[in-house]
Amino acid sequence: MSTNGESPAPEGAGDSRDPSGFLSEIIGAPVTVKLNSGIVYKGDLQSVDGYMNIALERCKEVAEGRVIRNWGDAFVRGNNVTYISADNA
């Protein structure tokens, strides 16, 4: 039981940081973006807004660990995004 009046995070819940705070911390960092269609993009996160619209630089489309296509700069509409993951640099 939490002593500060807050409910403890469920076991296995992971990091409980605010997603918008996390995203602002990783601007300029390498990320992986997975779309609802299953397509995966890797690139440097340049911006993200409240609708999860994402701008990437040095964007590459990746499948099965291989680069399929280099896109350069790319914009991804937020309603297509399944997740954004920070990559280890």
Swiss-Prot record:
GO terms for cellular component: nucleolus; P-body; sno(s)RNA-containing ribonucleoprotein complex; spliceosomal complex; U4/U6 x U5 tri-snRNP complex; U6 snRNP. One of its GO terms (molecular function) is RNA binding. Transmembrane segments: none annotated. It comes from the Eukaryota. Residues 1-21 are annotated as: Disordered. Residues 18-89 form the Sm domain. It holds the Pfam family LSM. The keyword RNA-binding applies. PROSITE patterns: SM. InterPro entries: Lsm6/sSmF, LSM_dom_sf, Sm, Sm_dom_euk/arc. One of its GO terms (biological process) is mRNA splicing, via spliceosome. It is found in: Cytoplasm; Nucleus. Coiled coil: none annotated. Keywords: Cytoplasm, mRNA processing, mRNA splicing, Nucleus, Ribonucleoprotein, RNA-binding, rRNA processing, Spliceosome, tRNA processing. SMART domains: Sm. Component of the heptameric LSM1-LSM7 complex, which consists of LSM1, LSM2, LSM3, LSM4, LSM5, LSM6 and LSM7. Component of the heptameric LSM2-LSM8 complex, which consists of LSM2, LSM3, LSM4, LSM5, LSM6, LSM7 and LSM8. The LSm subunits form a seven-membered ring structure with a doughnut shape. Belongs to the snRNP Sm proteins family. SmF/LSm6 subfamily. Component of LSm protein complexes, which are involved in RNA processing and may function in a chaperone-like manner, facilitating the efficient association of RNA processing factors with their substrates. Component of the cytoplasmic LSM1-LSM7 complex, which is thought to be involved in mRNA degradation by activating the decapping step in the 5'-to-3' mRNA decay pathway. Component of the nuclear LSM2-LSM8 complex, which is involved in splicing of nuclear mRNAs. PANTHER family: SMALL NUCLEAR RIBONUCLEOPROTEIN F SNRNP-F (PTHR11021), U6 SNRNA-ASSOCIATED SM-LIKE PROTEIN LSM6 (PTHR11021:SF1). This is U6 snRNA-associated Sm-like protein LSm6.
